[in-house]
Amino acid sequence: MKKIQHPLMALLLLATALSVACSADRTETVSSPDGNIEIKFCLTPQGEPTYSATYKDRPIVANSLMGFEIKDAEPLTGGFRMDGVNSSETHETWAPVWGENDSIVNNYRQMAVNLSRGDLKMNIEFRVYDDGFGFRYLFPEQPAKQYVV
């Protein structure tokens, strides 16, 4: 194990870790079907979405802030409130039109986190497979809002 030789660097790392600290009562988790991968989602006290990931209880993604910035618009990085969480599990097989395999198994657990900030609604959907995970942002239809994709 390497010793941190720069006290300023150690202080910076500590400040970063504390800045994305979550409220323990609002932490949601979803794991892979085999239980090896676990994703934790929470909001900081400032309403910033964060997630972390572990594999066999070892960290693979430290607490990381989520959100994004849109040109000429307010950033979608904080001030959110969690309105609900929906979880589901999928185990299906489908046949590709072409390729090496006749069938592909689609086996994952999903967690959709519903967030709001004022009249803005945003969902973050996590899918966790036995061999990896992903997430995406979804914007449900909203009155008086127009999005261009």
What are these regions (language model features)?
Residues 9-19:
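Bacterial N-terminal signal peptides
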Residues 2-3, 23-25, 36:
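Bimodal feature
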Residues 18-29:
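Bacterial Sec-dependent signal peptides at the C-terminal "C-region" and cleavage site
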Residues 1-10:
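Bacterial N-terminal signal peptides that target proteins for export
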Residues 27-149:
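N-terminal accessory beta-strand-rich subdomains and adjacent acidic, glycine-rich linkers
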